[in-house]
Amino acid sequence: MAIIKKFRIKNFKRKKEILKLDKISVYFGKRKIFEDLSFNLNQGEILGLLGPNGVGKSTIFNIIIGLLKPNYGSVFIDNKNVTDNPIFYRTKEHKISYVPQHGGYFHDLTLRENLKAISEMVIEDKKLRDEKI
């Protein structure tokens, strides 16, 4: 089981909930990854997931960004249920990004090239894309 650690940034006064996973269950075939997992994240908090390989850390992040849909449960971002929304909606509307630990989406590209390729899918204006990267 993954251990969820939250740290609060000092002097950050807002406490708006920005992320909530509510009773998330994930199964790969008959294998239970986790069941009824719930947690929230407020503005000013940093989330860390700890645990050995295979306990569901990457699965949790894939659910948050929309690459994977849970078998049961809901994902809320800014109090909006986004469980059925694709990754492109979440990244564009909620400014969520994800950099995988093993070299990015396209293994032959640099980090900058990966960011550029992904940004082309969600930011139409080329000048704005170049500024952001």
Stretch-by-stretch model annotation:
Residues 58-59:
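Conserved Walker
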Residues 74-76, 80:
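ATP-binding/catalytic-site motifs of ATP-hydrolyzing domains
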Residues 81-97, 102:
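ABC ATPase NBD coupling module
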Residues 102, 108-121:
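Q-loop/switch helix immediately C-terminal to the Walker
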Residues 65:
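Helix-to-loop junction immediately C-terminal to a conserved catalytic motif
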Residues 19-21, 34-36:
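Conserved structural motif at the start of ABC-family nucleotide-binding domains
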Residues 50-52:
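The feature captures the beta-strand-to-loop junction immediately N-terminal to the Walker
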